[in-house]
Amino acid sequence: MSEHGADLRFDSPEKEIKHWKSKVADMQDALRETESSLQDFVESSKELEQEMEKELSASNKTISDLKRRNEQLSGDLEDWKSKYSRALSEHNATLTTLQKELGQLRESVDIYKAKLRDTELTNDELENAERMVASSLADMEGKYNKTIEKTALLEEELIEKTRLDEENQRLKDELREMTEEMTILRDLVTRSRAISRADTMASSTYDDSTAPRSEQSFDSSPIKPSSAARATERPSSRQALSSPVTNRVPISRRLGAMGHNRRLSRDVRAAEAPSLAAVLDDSPTATTTSAAPTRSSTLSRRDPLAATPYHHGASTSHGLTSSPSARAQLRASVRAAARIGGAVSVSSAPRSTNLSANGGAAGSKRMMAEMISKMKALESRINSAKDLSRVVGPGDESAIPRPSSRMATIGSPSANGHNSIHMPTSTPRAPRASMDGNRTIGSSIPVPSRVRRPSSRMSERGTPPMPSLGLPRAQTPSSLHARGSSRADGPSPLPLHEFMDHDPASTLPHAARYAAAQASVAKRRTSMSGSGMSHSASHGSLAKVRSGSTLPRSTTPSTVAAPRVTQSSMTYYGAEASMSKRTPLSTRLASSHRNASSARGSINGPPSSWKTSAMPAQTLSRSRSSSLGSETETF
């Protein structure tokens, strides 16, 4: 105001007072306004303070509530923190445990992988070993079959050798006895000729007075040859053994007759022996007293000496027999005749002048004819025994008697419940050709028929299964051993549990074993005709059969060589062989490899190739006998 007052200049003091009064009035108005404003402000501030107190009390209450809530939440937080820490520790422990277990499982997986790898390697090695064992088994089976056949051949040869040794010893004994009998008979013939000569001279001297009767007696007496002629005509023991009569029947025919007689004596067991029609020559009595029939080309029971009553009995008693009783009767009759002849010669010496010429001449002729016939029979037997090894050739039919077939096909029960048994009760006999080939002799030995027989599986199974054939991993020896997929509509393998305890000799067909009989007989004859009893030829032929099919399929040897085969059985199995067809082993192995490729490495059991498939409705059952028992093989 001072500044305003200093700046203000009044004209008069009244104006100055007036001015200052107006100023005071303005200031008082401003004061009143300010006081009213203050009063309003105080009132508003009181209201505001009340409201603020209310708000403060509410805020304090809220704060207390929030604090209490905060404390509660803090406690919950601590609880959750402890729970979290505890869960975290548990999680860490669990994680550690799981990590340890994971490490262990990884180690176990690695170990199992290594074991699986080792197992697979071992499995591969075992399968390789199994294939090697299968091939070795097939090889050993082939060797076993070959050994069986060789053993059968050796047994047959040993039996034949034993029989021939016995025959040789018997013939030696008979030769010695017959030599002694020939010596006795020769002395007897010499004495009888001297006695008959003395009787003839005495009768001619006595009958000189009656010329017609003396001529008749002289004609009826035997002609007296000179000493040189008698020495020429009288056969010595060496001539009887080495110089047979020229008009004798061929030795092959006599050997055939001997074999036929032996077979008749063995099979028929008849007491009647065949005659000596093809062996003995015509005697002087037979040519002078009877019209003897001519000899036929075949052996018959009629002999030229049977025309007279005397030789009818001699033809059967002195025949060429092989039974011991007949030989003993022959020797007894010869000794009895020798004793009777000696007694007659001794007793007729003092009475030679009293005997009539006709009776003495006829008796001496009969005695000489009988002795000559006996000597000729003995000579023929000795010559036949000496020429036995020379006549029997490798290509000839054997004249040696063989044992009859004792085989019987005994099989397992058939479809109708009965056993299929084939016994050779009425075995047909094929005619056996003689050695000289101009006639046939009915034989009692069963001859194998010439029909085509089923081939064996030895030529197919001789090659062992090698890895080059594509043998599957799951292939087993049973599928190699008994697979016959091409033999019928379905395969018929051998079960697995029967493989190791199964006889390999019985796996082959029965007819194939029969087929080995003919081959074994042929090889036996070949080995007999060679150097002694060697069987190198048969072993070579068996090796050929093992290595390849050089022999025809009808003569392929099998596991077991049967001794003999009847013709009816061979015809039956030959008819069965035409109903089955065979395929090589390599083809069957290739097909089995293709079929069993899906079963490689299977762990659920054996592959499908091991399992026996359903057999077709129409099957042919053929029984076979083995060393382990009877089994049935189906086609």
From Swiss-Prot:
GO terms for molecular function: microtubule binding. Its main location: cytoplasm. It comes from the Eukaryota. Disulfide bonds: none annotated. Self-associates. Interacts with PAC1. One of its GO terms (cellular component) is cytoplasm. Residues 280-299, 516-541, 620-635 have a biased composition (Low complexity). InterPro entries: NUDE, NUDE_dom. SUPFAM superfamilies: Tropomyosin. Residues 35-63, 200-267, 279-328, 389-504, 516-635 are annotated as: Disordered. Belongs to the nudE family. Transmembrane segments: none annotated. This is Nuclear distribution protein nudE homolog 1. Residues 14-192 form a coiled coil. Residues 43-56 have a biased composition (Basic and acidic residues). It is found in: Cytoplasm, Cytoskeleton. Residues 201-224, 237-246, 314-326, 411-428, 547-571, 580-619 have a biased composition (Polar residues). Keywords: Coiled coil, Cytoplasm, Cytoskeleton, Microtubule, Transport. GO terms for biological process: centrosome localization; chromosome segregation; establishment of chromosome localization; establishment of mitotic spindle orientation; microtubule nucleation; vesicle transport along microtubule. Gene3D superfamilies: 6.10.250.1080. Required for nuclear migration.
